[in-house]
Every structure is written in structure tokens, then in C-alpha cells.
Amino acid sequence: MTATRLDGKATRDEIFVELATRAAALKAAGKTPGLGTILVGDDPGSHAYVRGKHADCAKVGLNSIRRDLPADIDQATLCATIDELNANPDCTGYIVQLPLPKHLDENEALERIDPDKDADGLHPTNLGRLVLGKEAPLPCTPRGIVYLLRRYDVKLDGAHVVVIGRGVTVGRPLGLLLTRRSENATVTLCHTGTRDLAALTRQADIIVAAAGVPHMVTADMVKPGAAVVDVGVSRVDDKLTGDVAEDVWDVAGYVSPNPGGVGPLTRAFLLTNVIERAERS
């Protein structure tokens, strides 16, 4: 068996066509959505991510607002920049690119974002709304995972999903999305400290690996025909690699590659959150 590739790039391109149509309709109605970014420091990876997001804006037809700050700024300067975007009518939604330099308080910065302008969907208020089933910007990576599985007709209703990783960007909110009535999956949330992880993953219809441990999910941990979504990101020999080993492709029914799987959809749903807010306003 060779697994079907869950192609995030092709799926992203399909979403971009739809988003461009919606952005054009908003412009025709006198509304031009704008995505803002706040980037602190000189981290090459962060700069690459931010460049990609602004390139995406150009493809879809969104305005983009970029605030690049030196690494040695203080907390007050960062907070003032956040306040500026909160008040900027041209900024429909924005993100603070993480990680921040260690001397800055990430939680304070993220909580200062106007929840209605939270393009990442990770503000505590919006995560609380997700728990309550209320309308709010959804976390981009979990939303992308669910969309990608549906795009390839991977059955979610009644499925047992094992999520490996307990971070706030993927693992925790993904469980909330998958257990909504619209998805109706059963979720087991695991992490690097879970005992006998393989016994749990072998029961899973879907495995989502988001622990950041290179090649931790191997073929002997996967039920034949299961779907495996690789979200982990690590560097091995100066190359980006995921949490899923190559031999999994010989056992699984579906595999999302990494890179090229969920990552493009994370960026697509960042723009989706911005456009949706413009449509609601």
C-alpha cells in the first residue's frame, strides 16, 4: 500500500480562488480587508513566514500592513504597536509573529490583541468562545487539518482521532474542533509523556502528530489504512522535518507530507479569518 497524499498546496490554491472572489466582492462594496503583522527581531524563519503571509495577501487581493521592530525593543513599545493596530481601521485582523525575543512577555502581548482582530484565533477570549460553541475566529492550523481531511473524504463522524501534542496552537484547540457535532469525532489527546503511545495510535482511525519530535510516528504505530497528519516541525541536519517517519507511507491510507501538507492551509485560513471578519462588519 502507498498512501494517498493529502496535498495542502493544491488545496490552498483552491481556497485562494474562492478568497479572491470574496475579497473582490468586499472591495466592490467599499470594504478592503487588511492583514497586519507585527514582527520583532531578525529570526530568518519568522521573516520568511511573514514574507509568505504578505505574498498571500497580494495573491488574494488583501491589503497588508507590516510592522517590523528591532529585537531590543521593550514591552511598552511592543504593546504600543499592538494598540496602534487595534485602533487602525485599515487593519481588519493581525498577528504577532512568534516566537518573540525571550525578554518580552508573549502572553501579555497576545492578550492585548483586540479579540475581534485576532487573525490567528488564539486569543484567550476566542478559545473560550470555541469551548462554548460561539462564533469566533478559529485557530488556523486546526481548522486547516479538519478542512484537509474533509477535502479528501476522510471520515470524521465517529472516527477515533489520536492527537499527539498538547500545545495551544494545535493539540488543544484541535480536540475542541473535532468533537463538535459537525465533526463528531472521538479524540484522545496524547503528548511526549504518554505511556505506551503506540498502543493508542494503533487504535486510531486518524493520527495527528504535532509534538515536534522528528520521525516519532513510525509504521508499526499505525493501523493499516489510517490517515496520518504530520504537523510537527523540527530541524535535522539543517533541514525541516516532521514527526512522521517515511515508512508510514507504506501502511497508512492517507498521509499529509511535511512540509507541503497542513502548513499552506494554516496561511490560507489566516486570510479566511480576516475576510470573514470583513464580511461580518
Curated annotation (Swiss-Prot):
Annotated function: Catalyzes the oxidation of 5,10-methylenetetrahydrofolate to 5,10-methenyltetrahydrofolate and then the hydrolysis of 5,10-methenyltetrahydrofolate to 10-formyltetrahydrofolate.
Stated family: Belongs to the tetrahydrofolate dehydrogenase/cyclohydrolase family.
Subunit structure: Homodimer.
Keyword Nuclease listed: no
Metabolic or biological pathway, per its Swiss-Prot or TrEMBL entry: One-carbon metabolism; tetrahydrofolate interconversion
GO biological process terms, semicolon-separated: L-histidine biosynthetic process; methionine biosynthetic process; purine nucleotide biosynthetic process; tetrahydrofolate interconversion
Gene Ontology MF annotations: methenyltetrahydrofolate cyclohydrolase activity; methylenetetrahydrofolate dehydrogenase (NADP+) activity
Keywords, comma-separated and alphabetical: Amino-acid biosynthesis, Histidine biosynthesis, Hydrolase, Methionine biosynthesis, Multifunctional enzyme, NADP, One-carbon metabolism, Oxidoreductase, Purine biosynthesis
Ranges that cross the membrane: none
InterPro entries registered for this protein in UniProt: Aminoacid_DH-like_N_sf, NAD(P)-bd_dom_sf, THF_DH/CycHdrlase, THF_DH/CycHdrlase_cat_dom, THF_DH/CycHdrlase_NAD-bd_dom
Signal sequence interval, chain numbering: none
Highest rank taxon of the organism: Bacteria
GO CC term (a single one): cytosol
Reaction(s) the record says it catalyses: (6R)-5,10-methylene-5,6,7,8-tetrahydrofolate + NADP(+) = (6R)-5,10-methenyltetrahydrofolate + NADPH; (6R)-5,10-methenyltetrahydrofolate + H2O = (6R)-10-formyltetrahydrofolate + H(+)
Protein name: Bifunctional protein FolD
Binding site for NADP(+): G165, R166, G167, T192, V233
Known EC number: 1.5.1.5, 3.5.4.9
The keyword Oxidoreductase is annotated on this UniProt entry: yes
Coiled-coil parts of chain: none
